[in-house]
Structures are given as C-alpha cells and as structure tokens.
C-alpha cells in the first residue's frame, strides 16, 4: 500500500525544519494537508507504507522525552524507515566527543535525517550547518519546538475547520517556553488572533514580543482574555521558576492562571483546551478540565504521529 494520492502534491523543498519563522502560510497548509493523508494511513489495519524504505532516521535526544521521541519513532517506522534512537548517556559524548564530531560519525554511518532535541538553544542550527541530510528540531532550549506547533495547528483545524480569525489564548510560562514561540509563529502566520497571558515575571517586556508580533495582545488578566476564546493553550509551569523567585507560590499562580471549568465557561462554547504536556494537574490546569469534552490534549498526542510523518515524508524528497 502507498501513501494516499493527496500526499503526493507539490513537495516541500526545504531541507531542514528548525522553526516556523521562515514558513509561509502555504507551506504550513501543505504540511497540514499531508498530515490528513498520513492520519488516514494510521487508521488502516496495517499502519505502514513503504515510502521511506531504505532511509535511516536517527533520533538524537540530549534531553528526556516521552511524547516527542516516541512520536517520531512511530512516524519513521510507519513510513518504513530504519529508525535509530541515540541518547547521550553511554555514548562517546560522555567521553568528551563534541556534538559536531558525533554528527559526523552518524553521517558516516549512513544517517539520512537527524531528529534532534537539545537543552541548548540553537544546537540544531549548528548541526544543520555540518550535516548533509535533513535536520528536524524536536525542541532546543527555550527557543523553538516547531513540530509541536504544527501538531497544535493540525489539531485545531481538524476540530474547528479553520485557523484564520480564531481567538487563541496562550497561558503560562511564556518567557521560558519553546512551545509558545513556535505556536506564535504558526498561529499568527495562519491568521489567528493570539493573546499571551502570564504573570509579568513569566512574560518579560511587552516590547520584546511586540517587535516581532505587533498585533499580539498581552495581558495578566486571564478571566478577561478567555472571554469568547476559541482556543485556550496552557503551558507547563516549570516549578524551578518558583525557586528562582519568579513566583510567590504555586497556590498563588493557580489562583490567577490555572485553567478551571469556570474560566472555560467564559470562552466560546466550542472552545478547545490544549496543553503540550507534560501536565502539572492542579497547578496550570484542573484535572476535570484536562479530561473534559473540550480538552483535546490526547488528540494532540495522537496527531503528533501523523504530522511528523508528513514532515519526514516531505523532507525526504521521495
């Protein structure tokens, strides 16, 4: 069996996926359309097509990951690629080998694509300068997480039928979130109206955001900004921020910024509640909201496989 014909439309010709800042709305649209075809593949009795047979994908994760790593592994295997999972622990990296030397070694071993997560912002960009194949950023420091943003866009469009004109509220630790930055690029590029909501200490100077996204709304009043929202995206509160003195207490944060049923009731009746995971239930989102009919958190996880299949397919040139 092959990939559905719709996925064989004009192919995305870029070599790497490092962030969404240089993606056009048309490029994003093409990826989302390809993901629809890949979701159809995943709905078959045999969830595999031979599209990337003979290709080798190396998942290089220098940070712990469950959703993203497994999602990429499943995506590669569904396309019949050889998937190798690399971890720094026990590798030559622990013996002092540089990142670039490691990449050159993987290249010599025949890797065609690298999927990379790293704690240092910009690490995938550096690797892309030295690797002859394709590099996909699976999250770098607090900089970017483009595939998370793409699966968020896909989930919203699958549920609501469009992205343009929607009111999207992103709540939480904006300042330190790679997801927030990539979601900003994705949702604004596709025509959504985005509001950022966070304590001042977790969002930073308004001028910083407005310089890139002048139409952005920035506030610390969650009760007001969720009114008539189509999408509420809450981010994981990194508890180390409290230790750094950026928050008085978790209880205080939850009081003003947690997604509760009462706050969701202020939003549009069709409002989607989203979270990139992992969640701190009872802190940034209440347990009843996380499993409510309006929550699409599990759908985000499931859709990640189809979206990452679409990216691997389009980058492969097959």
Curated annotation (Swiss-Prot):
Q: Which PROSITE patterns match?
A: CARBAMOYLTRANSFERASE
> Which residues does the record give as L-aspartate binding sites?
95, 178, 236
Assigned keywords, A-Z: Pyrimidine biosynthesis, Transferase
Which Enzyme Commission numbers does its entry carry? 2.1.3.2
BP GO terms, sorted: 'de novo' pyrimidine nucleobase biosynthetic process; 'de novo' UMP biosynthetic process; amino acid metabolic process
Q: Please give the Gene Ontology molecular function terms for this protein.
A: amino acid binding; aspartate carbamoyltransferase activity
Query: An example Gene Ontology cellular component term from the record?
Result: cytosol
Q: In which pathway does it act?
A: Pyrimidine metabolism; UMP biosynthesis via de novo pathway; (S)-dihydroorotate from bicarbonate: step 2/3
Which Pfam families does this UniProt record tie to the protein? OTCace, OTCace_N
**List of residues binding carbamoyl phosphate:** 67-68, 117, 145, 148, 277-278
Give the reaction(s) catalysed. Answer: carbamoyl phosphate + L-aspartate = N-carbamoyl-L-aspartate + phosphate + H(+)
Which superkingdom? Bacteria
The similarity comment for this entry is: Belongs to the aspartate/ornithine carbamoyltransferase superfamily. ATCase family.
**Function of the molecule:** Catalyzes the condensation of carbamoyl phosphate and aspartate to form carbamoyl aspartate and inorganic phosphate, the committed step in the de novo pyrimidine nucleotide biosynthesis pathway.
NCBIfam families linked to this entry: asp_carb_tr, PRK00856.1
What do we know about how this protein assembles, alone or with others?
A: Heterododecamer (2C3:3R2) of six catalytic PyrB chains organized as two trimers (C3), and six regulatory PyrI chains organized as three dimers (R2).
Q: What is this protein called?
A: Aspartate carbamoyltransferase catalytic subunit
- Recorded source organism is Roseiflexus castenholzii (strain DSM 13941 / HLO8)
> Which gene holds the coding sequence for this protein?
pyrB
């Amino acid at each position: 069996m092959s990939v559905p014909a719709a996925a064989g439309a004009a192919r995305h010709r870029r070599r790497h996926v490092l962030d969404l800042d240089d993606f056009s709305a048309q490029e994003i649209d093409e990826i989302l359309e390809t993901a629809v075809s890949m979701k159809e593949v995943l709905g078959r009795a045999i969830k595999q097509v031979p599209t990337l047979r003979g290709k080798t994908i190396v998942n290089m994760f220098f940070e712990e990951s469950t959703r993203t790593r497994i999602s990429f592994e499943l995506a590669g295997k569904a396309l019949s690629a050889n998937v190798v999972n690399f971890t720094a622990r026990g590798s030559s990296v622990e013996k002092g080998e540089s990142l670039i030397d490691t990449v050159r070694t993987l290249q010599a071993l025949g890797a065609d694509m690298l999927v990379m997560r790293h704690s240092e912002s910009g690490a995938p960009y550096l690797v892309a300068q030295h690797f002859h194949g394709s590099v996909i950023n699976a999250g770098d420091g607090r900089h970017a997480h483009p595939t998370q943003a793409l699966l968020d866009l896909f989930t919203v469009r699958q549920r609501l039928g469009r992205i343009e004109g929607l009111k999207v509220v992103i709540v939480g630790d904006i300042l330190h979130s790679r997801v927030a930055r990539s979601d900003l690029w994705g949702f604004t590029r596709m025509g959504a109206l985005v509001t950022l909501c966070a304590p001042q200490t977790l969002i930073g100077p308004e001028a910083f955001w407005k310089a890139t996204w002048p139409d952005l709304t920035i506030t610390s009043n969650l009760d007001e900004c969720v009114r008539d929202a189509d999408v509420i995206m809450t981010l994981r509160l990194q508890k180390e921020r409290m230790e750094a003195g950026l928050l008085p207490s978790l209880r205080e944060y939850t009081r003003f910024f947690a997604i509760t049923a009462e706050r969701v009731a202020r939003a549009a009746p069709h409002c989607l509640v989203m979270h990139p995971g992992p969640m701190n239930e009872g802190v940034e989102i209440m347990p009843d909201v996380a499993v409510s009919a309006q929550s699409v958190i599990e759908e985000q996880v499931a859709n990640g496989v189809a979206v990452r299949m679409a990216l691997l397919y389009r980058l492969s040139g097959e």
